[in-house]
Amino acid sequence: MKDRLIEFGYAAGWRLVRVLPLSVARRLFMAAADRAYAANGPGTQRLRRNLQQIVPDMPDLLVRAGLRSYARYWLEAFRLPTQSRQQLLAGLGMSDENFAELKSLIADGRGVVLALPHVGNWDAAAAWVVSHGWPMVTVAERLKPEGVFEQFVAYREKLGMEVLPLTGGRRPPLDVLAERLQQGIVVALLGDRDLSRGGVEVSFFGGRTRMPAGPAILAIRTGAPLIAVDLSFTPTKTWAVLRRITPATEGALDVRVKATTQLLADAFAQGIADHPQDWHMLQKLWL
């Protein structure tokens, strides 16, 4: 019964937010974020500790700003399927230089690995990619209950991307992703939190954590370009900054994967430090 209620809650949220006027929905979501800040529950406390790792002398209002940013992600994510192609394209911006580089790399036909932390609105970024006519594949954590996972998969497939389960699929996701890169398809992966317990240990904001090895392995094995993507919120859209990563070439594969993952961690840190309020990390990260 609990699982059914959770599934119903997500489904109702998706439907309700889509039909509400944006101004009304925004007020509701910001009020919910402020209530979460005042309640100071486990997620809020964890966000505070994570932000203190980044900004040791931070004002506590940064936590409130972080919760509001997270609420904005959910508000926008729920409403994405109702938007037109032109609205999806207008919802994300980047510099002309970054756009030209990305377009050129995709046109080369070797695929592109886009790795990013949990920042800004990654679903809006994915929708922007596929709205350009560039096929894209990603991996989704198998959430519980199963019905919620299926809703998230259906939601992202409706936006135009292929979604592979992190676990429980017919084939290992890395094998499928490597094939997709060889077909010239864009691979997008969240890369700041390891879910497999087999991640690479890296230095991150003065502490040690583990990050998934997948982006580095794919880039090294296939030769596909590797890009660290930084996303942040402006008043009207998501803004992207692309940082090209050159994979390590010296040593055994595990040595190169570790060094390349550290380069990604450094690039992630650079972006997060610029806008810590837009990093949606409400889980334990550091070892």
Language-model features: locations:
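Membrane-anchoring hydrophobic helices of lipid-metabolizing enzymes
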Residues: 1-116, 149, 153, 160
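Non-catalytic C-terminal accessory region of glycerolipid acyltransferases
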Residues: 36, 54-60, 64, 104-106, ...
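Active-site metal-coordination segments of metallo-dependent hydrolases
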Residues: 45-46, 145-146, 209-212
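A conditional alpha-helix N-cap/helix-loop micro-motif detector
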Residues: 91-96, 118-119, 145, 167-171, ...
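Conserved beta-strand termini and adjacent loop/short-helix elements that scaffold enzyme active sites
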Residues: 97, 139-141, 166, 243-245, ...
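Short amphipathic alpha-helical segments and helix-helix/interface helices
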Residues: 99-103, 126, 152-153, 177-178, ...
